[in-house]
Amino acid sequence: MNKKSDTPTSLYEKEERGENIMKKKNFTVLLATLALGAALLTGCGSQESTADDAATAETTETTETTESADSAADASDTQELETIKVGASITPHAEILAQVKDKLAEEGYDLEIVEYNDYVLPNTALEDGELDANFFQHQPYLDDFNAENGTHLVSVAAVHFEPFGLYAGKTSILDELKEGASVAVPNDTTNEARALLLLEAQGLIKLKEDAGLSATVLDIVENPLNLEIKEIEAAQLVRSLPDVDIAAINGNYAAEGGLNVADAIAVEASDSLAADTYANVIAVKEGNEDSAKTKALVDAVLSDDVKTYINDTYGNAVIPVF
């Protein structure tokens, strides 16, 4: 019989072939496992990367939005206010204006107050465009100034009345005035007339019947004591007191000089022609009556808060008329 027998050598070869086959299978499984693991890791990494990218983008967008909002807020905070420049005598006009500075700032305006100690420069500065408004004078003075100087200024609001008073210099009682006593009065036309009317009301002089608010020393028709009328610039009247017997002084300059209307020898009556005529006004150049600046200024000044301030601060020396 020619059947091939299984020798030891043959058995060994079979076993060796079997082991090689198993190694190949195991290696294939290992490769597949590694490939699957790599795929899973790659997928997770991709998802994490995408999530990280999204989070980064969201953070960046939020930061940019916040920075944009902060920038807008900063720009709003630092936005320049539009200036309203107003000329005024110190007392009470500049002091009254100071009360509305914060209110105007809330409305977008920076109130700049320029103080003057005379009655000419505030009007020339307003006419020349150096000011947006002024606040120091009454209507008769404004009308007279326009007529004499060819200016174009108009009143936009009446604010308060300041009673004119006779104040003691060398003499403290009117009945003690002697022959030839000196009396200081303002040297501008309208305020001089007002002073003369006050002297007339006290029986010290008599004026022409039609003199009225245009009265000057030339309109004096009776002067029993032969009083010496000294015409002095209004801002200097308080300083003149040591050199004269009495002086007729505007309410604002009296207050500025430390005088109290309660201490005056005589004061304009509340029902006098002066009280009806001499309210102090806010003035602007013609053509600016309805400007946004003018309206904002007038609304701020003609308020209950300002009225209360005037009454509490000045008493009978300054009387609101609005």
Range-by-range predicted roles:
Residues 163-174, 278-291:
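A bilobed periplasmic-binding-protein/Venus flytrap-type ligand-binding module shared by bacterial periplasmic
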